[in-house]
Amino acid sequence: MKRLNNLESYWMPFTANRDFKKDPRMVVAADGMYYKSETGQDILDSAAGLWCVNAGHNRPEITSAISEQAATLDFAPSFQYGHPKSFELASRVADIFPKGLDHVFFTNSGSEAVDSTLKIALAYHRARGKGTKTRLIGRERGYHGVGFGGISVGGMPRNRQYFGSLLTGVDHISHTFLPEKNRFSKGSPEHGDYLADTLEDIIALHDASNIASVIVEPVAGSTGVLPPPKNYLKRRREICDKHDILLIFDEVITGFGRLGKATASEYFGVTPDIISCAKAITNGIIPMGAAVVSKEIYDTMMDEADMPIELFHGYTYSGHPIASAAGLAALDIYRDEDLFNKAGKTAKYLENIVHQLKNDKNVIDIRNLGLVAAIEVAPRPGAVGARGYEAMKKAWHKGLMLRVTGDTLAFSPPLIAENHDIDKIFEIVQSVLKELD
């Protein structure tokens, strides 16, 4: 197939641009579990695009909804005006999210959703007369998008180091990565719940009267798939309740079925005060995100506001009509095909298959929870990430798209994946691992 255009103008995100142009990995179509490369090769998608295409690619239900909406109402401002589908989608999201989290603020991405949660937390405390509660607490190795709020509370050094001074008044508690104790764990690891107590050290230093919120990914994804230790999130909730600190779950990856439930909050039985979500809310077809907040937060903002506008925050495309239509169609698919429950069942098969690779000479750890898994390969001396990157490129040429972060190969297949799809994914991965030096 003829190259569609030259590759010089587009600056690709989170990509080794110079290397990509030497050996491009271009897709031109997608359907179901597969992409189609520009050379006509079928590429099995083991990453749901980028953790987002939960119902599989090219769903006619969603493309039809988008087309019909674009032909009816292409855009409507969300500042001081509304349209029905944004209200309908908000209600549908609230219905499947944890009880009590029933108000939805729409954004355009996970990064915007996270920054919105932080601003809402600060505004909430100010509205109830506790304006000194301004400190934000993140976690080492945490990923919360690429907005200045998100990289400030995030704990991935490469995402922070080039951008100078970030938000002030931010602290980070310890990560939960304990390979010496939890290597090759299946599901939530046994060791590490005590690490939630490092939050108490920060509270002792700054006093709870100065701390607004704590944000955490229930399952850390971009840092290499780190499921939380057993009881860790429950302990985090208890500490936040004790000190009147808001707990935020960043569910941009885990929201909408990734763990076999609508949310990780439901899966773990721990309800935060705010959830950020995005990606699968529209099946990845149209950019959209949301901050889903508790009734207590919303009611406080409504009751205590001293101006007609209760929250001076929003985006031009918040609740966009076409994105709302896509979201409603995606939620219909998740419900009608029972995809959340299907993912929970497939997760057990995935766990069994991925751990069969533990004896490969290059594999130093395997982690999994729900329909998410990671294989960590040993780094090359003096070249951290090189072996993982090579694995990603080899997999592509063998017909597999996978996500790589450092030397960790991450897997999050669409929720429609059947057992034979899982088999094929890891047959290719096994072949790739054998070729790594």
Where are the model-predicted features located?
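Conserved N-terminal phosphate-binding loop of PLP-dependent enzymes in the Aspartate aminotransferase
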Residues: 1-437
